[in-house]
Amino acid sequence: MDRSAGLPVRLLLLLLLLLLWSVAPQALRPGSHSLRYLFMGASKPDLGLPFFEALGYVDDQLFVSYNHESRRAEPRAPWILGQTSSQLWLQLSQSLKGWDYMFIVDFWTIMGNYNHSKVTKLRVVPESHILQVILGCEVHEDNSTSGFWKYGYDGQDHLEFCPKTLNWSAAEPRAWATKMEWEEHRIRARQSRDYLQRDCPQQLKQVLELQRGVLGQQVPTLVKVTRHWASTGTSLRCQALNFFPQNITMRWLKDSQPLDAKDVNPENVLPNGDGTYQGWLTLAVAPGEETRFSCQVEHPGLDQPLTATWEPSRSQDMIIGIISGITICAIFFVGILILVLRKRKVSGGTMGDYVLTECE
């Protein structure tokens, strides 16, 4: 089968999985870290999807992937490429293989409870359906933890696990059959709770230690402020580049005083792909007042806050000078052209009043 034919379906599946992810807790508290796994799969290969595929994220940065066909964990972050022989990686690979098996069993259970399979004389033939799972944990600055485990079926919320009660919350009536079946097996519920409250936080701490050992204590190597023009007006953008860990605070100052939060767009922080991060903060300003504003950055790797301001570059001054010169020259030549045309008009009128006499 042509794999390219399943690409649109794969993109749709990823979109559905992101929708499922969006309802999981993602706004990390300052000093917190997270470990998340996204599982997805299709019941039939005609969708161009594997039976099981897994993506692992630490602090929202992809670091491992796995699929049912290869049955191998693949490193997806530069800082973990050389660690595939470590004990942590071997444990991670074994966990993903176990989840592969459990995912397929759960998939068949859910489809059976939905009557989404056809029974023939020879075998049970499943219909085409999609299962998504998100699970993981967070370790907060005070060393407390929280976990989550959710199932989505055909793009809709299905079940969510509650570690405190060991129960499953059904998102729709047809999920009750699976809920009751899973809650009868208390061993599974206790194992799920132990993973979220013990194993997952331990693994997260190990991954973070490995990441820090490879990257070291990165700090913003460059903080700069740039000016931008648009149809909506003038804005300043503050950029902090190549820092680690992810936690960073960026704020705008006007005349050395912090601006009200309601006047500032929220900061954006994204991974670079090499284990470090970049962040930026924008602010709309009135033309001519750019120099009154400065950007202040705080980061664990800095001894004190770092402040940067916008400064016009020489190239910008040169461009402005050239544009001004061209404008003045254009006005000058237009003025000369108008004078010439006016003189020609006057001369043309005089010539029009003069009549040549006929030759005798």
Swiss-Prot record:
Residues making up the signal peptide according to the UniProt record: 1-25
One GO CC annotation: early endosome
First-listed, main subcellular location of the protein, grouped into a coarse class: membrane
Coiled-coil residue spans: none
Cystine connections: 137-200, 238-295
GO MF assignments: beta-2-microglobulin binding; co-receptor binding; signaling receptor binding; transferrin receptor binding
SUPFAM superfamilies xref list: Immunoglobulin, MHC antigen-recognition domain
Membrane topology: Single-pass type I membrane protein
Chain ranges passing through the membrane: 320-340
Positions of the UniProt region annotated as Alpha-3: 219-310
Positions annotated as glycosylated: 115, 143, 167, 247
Sequence ranges on the Cytoplasmic membrane side: 341-360
Biological process according to GO: acute-phase response; BMP signaling pathway; cellular response to iron ion; cellular response to iron ion starvation; female pregnancy; hormone biosynthetic process; intracellular iron ion homeostasis; iron ion transport
Region annotation (Alpha-2) ranges: 128-218
A Pfam family this chain is assigned to: C1-set
Residue span of region Alpha-1: 26-127
InterPro entries: Ig-like_dom, Ig-like_dom_sf, Ig-like_fold, Ig/MHC_CS, Ig_C1-set, MHC_class-I_related, MHC_I-like_Ag-recog, MHC_I-like_Ag-recog_sf
Subunit composition and interactions: Binds TFR through the extracellular domain in a pH-dependent manner.
Primary role: Binds to transferrin receptor (TFR) and reduces its affinity for iron-loaded transferrin.
Name of this protein: Hereditary hemochromatosis protein homolog
Protein source organism: Rattus norvegicus
